[in-house]
Amino acid sequence: YTDSPDLAVSDWLKWTEDGDPYWTRFYAENSREMLYDWVIDLGVEWNRVAMGGFENSLPRFHFTEHGALDVVQALVRTVIGLPTVNFIWNKRVESILVDNSHVTGVEVMDVRTGETRTLKGEHIVIATGGFEGNLDKVLSNWIPDLPKPERLLIGASVHARGQGLDLASAAGAKISNLNRRYIYTNGIVNIRDPEGVMAVTAGNNDSMRVNTDGVRFTNEGGFDKNILKDMLSLGTATYWAIFDEPGRAGFAMRGAEWVNTPTDRHPLLDNPMITSKSMTLEELAELAGIPADRLVSSVARYNAMIDAGEDSDFNRFPEMNNIPPRIERAPFYAMQFYPMTRKSMGGVVIDADGRALNDSGQVVPGLYAIGEVTGSAGINGKHGMDGMFLGPAVVTGRVAGRTIVAAHAIRDEKIRIRTPAAEDPLPDPSSWVPTLTEDELGTLLTTSREGYWHFETSHEMVLERQYGCTQCHSAEVPFFPLNNRTSKSAQVELCSNCHGRQF
């Protein structure tokens, strides 16, 4: 097939309805050089390309073997190796400093000790992501013309709270379109979350979807923005995916650390807290709390349309090769789904150079924003596109970086780099041994400590998967933090022990 920037722009603007025309075209014309080729030079291997969502008339959604992990690892691995880049770990920005309308630095707090300090800089780049982990902020900036769901799950990072937006606004930046977001319709409750608000992304292409009345209500394979509208119009904004034993193989999920077994054999399918399971449809309906006669009738009609090769209700399978399997062989399954937050599509308004703008459209001197905190520069418009969040984050980041370098070049001056602290020495490999037992680690995890979220989450997985200490730790990565680039580089390579796993 033959693709072109013009065709990509046409496809994307049609889908998003009002995506930012400048950034849409810029991405179409420059993402090959600024993203695809660039990360290849950093060691990333693209291994397949797919259509992605319905927004593409040709395959454009590129994948690596382990997803975003491969790209993130390559970027972090590269930047850690740069002697001119300094890292300050476990700090949270409390405020952006402004002097005479110019941004001059940040006030930060150590999340473990509470100590504060000031960091000065002529150019401050906000790259804090969206706010889809903040339900209060999401619901107070809800999508116009769509009903608010009774129950909305969090499908974004627990750290996506929107602090970067608040910081930017306080520094004078304009914030827009906070009521635009990519809501997924396939969220199930994360059984590991005691509050029942965190989601896992799941789905089954071999299922049919019914509402609380047991009636099929949407084209399961249709446009996700149409499915969202159908789902939120249900009143209760929840549905059940109905499938049978052969259809169990169609189940898939992602987005949780504990997803570490082949999904068609995952115990979640046999967990009554998430999945109702029965030898008859009547009993299944009773377990799920939906009318039995309507569920039985809906399945019978669904099977009849499959036999006829025509979905006269929702046109799910207009072509014979897209026909899903019948639902007929016990045991039968019903899995309840809810809408879930995912990605922010509004945020800090920026210009073509990645500089933050104020309410008057003027540059906020010294302030930049990139990625999801800008709503991906408005590329996604009103309707999100697959693969169009990580990519624009990289591209807008590079745009801002080039702008900063150019600003110094115009003034014919070097960028001032703070002299890094002397590196800590690595332990002697010949004498290094693990010093923490499994019981001691378990005891350490019984109490949550401020600033140790990643430590606690990762080590809970260590105990669950029965990893030995040397799965991750060595003389290069000892049991205590080191200010040492060799150690940090070694840590980067360990991310795949938990993330991006393939089964």
For the regions a protein language model found, what residue spans apply to each?
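Helix-rich C-terminal "cap"/substrate-channel and partner-interaction subdomain
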Residues: T236-F332, A400-T403, A407-I410, K414-P427
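Helical element adjacent to the flavin cofactor pocket in flavoenzyme catalytic cores
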Residues: F63-E122, L165, S169-A171, V349
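Conserved N-terminal/central alpha/beta ligand/cofactor-binding core
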Residues: Y1-N86, N90, D136, R209, ...
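An anion/pyrophosphate-binding glycine-rich loop and adjacent beta-alpha core
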Residues: L165-L167, A171-I290
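C-terminal structured subdomain/cap of oxidoreductase catalytic cores
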Residues: A249-W258, L268, G346-I410
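Sequence context of c-type cytochrome heme-c attachment sites
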Residues: E423-S489
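Glycine-rich loop(s) and the adjacent beta-strand/alpha-helix scaffold that form part
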Residues: E115, L119-I188, G387-V399, T403
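A glycine-rich dinucleotide-binding beta-alpha-beta segment and adjacent secondary-structure elements
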Residues: S95, R294-A377
